[in-house]
């Protein structure tokens, strides 16, 4: 049997070897893995949750007509900084919770828990998002940098241990929303009304307690194996907390609205808004109760 000899190339150089099928498939597979990891990283950053950072624009929105272009830009930069800061926290929290999330019926499909995104990549991305958030804050004011740093410290403490303490975990989550509102006020140099901050804290605590209730109902006796704080929560105490935070949120919001300077017609619309706020919270609570 005679061997087939490849003809020499015209240039005198030996013919180039074509990549094998295995090598080609390996490269394609590697490219797909990188693409999946980047897509998973974007999902783990939870951009759909950035809507929560709209609370940064709450106080700037009240004085929209007097802000000017510079004030509007500062408010939007502050909001963007909190979007990055919150994504940084999500990535850190999911990295730390990846083992527990694998036992959760829903959270096991998260990119980090499912292995699509490596813990190393998630940690690096978390740090980069946090540093970028601080840099954006510096463009507005040093005080905004301090507030963003406080938010990152508070939420990192939550991820590292405070989430294991019942009721403290809810308070920390609610405090995060208060810091968002304060950040918006600082960005535009506005006063921070205590009544509004109280309403925001109570409203955020109300929503957080609702999530704890849903988790307790969904997981039952297994809830504490996923989140140690759930071993302390009881439906009766959560329901009492829901009633209390709902009342505080609506009353303080109503008092804040009444303290604003409105024309009579405007005051009526504001009170109507407070009533609508009550109904929204009520509808959420009814849904929780089934």
Region annotations inferred by a language model:
Residues 2-42, 160, 178-290:
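C-terminal membrane-associated helical module and adjoining short loops/tails
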Residues 98, 103-148, 194-204, 240-252:
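Multi-pass membrane catalytic core of lipid/isoprenoid biosynthesis enzymes
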Residues 62-67, 134-140, 251-263:
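Juxtamembrane "helix exit" motif at the C-terminal ends of alpha-helical transmembrane segments
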Residues 166-176:
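Cytoplasmic-side transmembrane-helix entry/capping segments in multi-pass membrane proteins
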């Amino acid at each position: 049997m005679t061997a087939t000899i490849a003809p020499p190339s015209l240039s005198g150089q030996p013919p180039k070897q074509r990549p094998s099928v295995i090598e080609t498939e390996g490269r394609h597979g590697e490219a797909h893995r990188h693409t999946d990891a980047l897509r998973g990283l974007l999902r783990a950053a939870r951009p759909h949750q950035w809507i929560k950072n709209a609370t940064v624009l709450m106080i700037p929105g009240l004085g929209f007509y007097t802000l000017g272009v510079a004030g509007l830009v500062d408010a939007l930069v502050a909001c963007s900084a909190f979007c990055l800061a919150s994504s940084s926290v999500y990535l850190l929290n999911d990295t730390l919770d990846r083992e527990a999330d694998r036992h959760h019926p829903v959270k096991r499909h998260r990119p980090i828990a499912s292995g699509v995104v490596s813990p190393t990549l998630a940690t690096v991305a978390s740090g980069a998002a946090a540093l970028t958030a601080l840099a954006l804050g510096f463009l507005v004011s040093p005080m905004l940098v301090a507030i963003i740093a406080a938010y990152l410290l508070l939420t990192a403490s939550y991820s590292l241990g405070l989430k294991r303490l019942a009721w403290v975990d809810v308070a920390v989550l609610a405090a995060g929303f208060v810091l968002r509102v304060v950040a918006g006020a600082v960005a535009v140099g506005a006063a921070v009304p205590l009544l509004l901050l109280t309403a925001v804290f109570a409203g955020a605590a109300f929503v957080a307690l609702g999530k704890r209730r849903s988790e307790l109902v969904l997981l039952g006796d297994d809830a504490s194996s996923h989140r140690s704080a759930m071993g302390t929560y009881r439906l009766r105490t959560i329901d009492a907390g829901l009633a209390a935070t709902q009342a505080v949120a609506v009353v303080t919001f109503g008092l804040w609205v009444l303290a604003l300077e409105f024309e009579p017609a405007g005051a009526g619309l504001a009170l109507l808004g407070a009533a609508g706020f009550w109904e929204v919270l009520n509808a959420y609570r009814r849904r929780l109760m089934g």
